[in-house]
Amino acid sequence: MTEKGEPVEYGELNILYQDEYFVAIDKPAGLLVHRSFLDKHETQFAMQMLRDQLGQHVFPVHRLDRPTSGVLLFALSSESARDMNKLFIEGTITKRYLALVRGFAPESFFLDKPLKEELDKIADKFATQNKAPQAAQTQFNCLHQATLPIPIG
């Protein structure tokens, strides 16, 4: 949504790579990967947009949060999606993010904080209540720090 509450029109997705098994797109910030009960008013989703653009079903291999832009990988068959998902679960494949942040950070630090699923009372009414936390480990490395001579606040 724009600042005026109007829906954003994303147009065609930028395809970064495509072969017979996978397609990678440049997901813009603000675009959901797929439909969600948590955002019922949204009408545009990367999965449906790419399906319409390619004229075939696509299967998300991973997700990026709505405010996150970056490379989003889709499989072109359920078998390819399953095989790639297995590699993510085994830790054979990892994701790497670059972020521009405000404030000061140490040169390097490691965060080991398992993700506990917080179920939504409506959307997850029938979901498993006692699901084990998902492993989540992140190594942070500061590539550069700068001070801008611009007052903020």
Predicted regions and their residues:
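RNA pseudouridine synthases
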Residues: 1-153
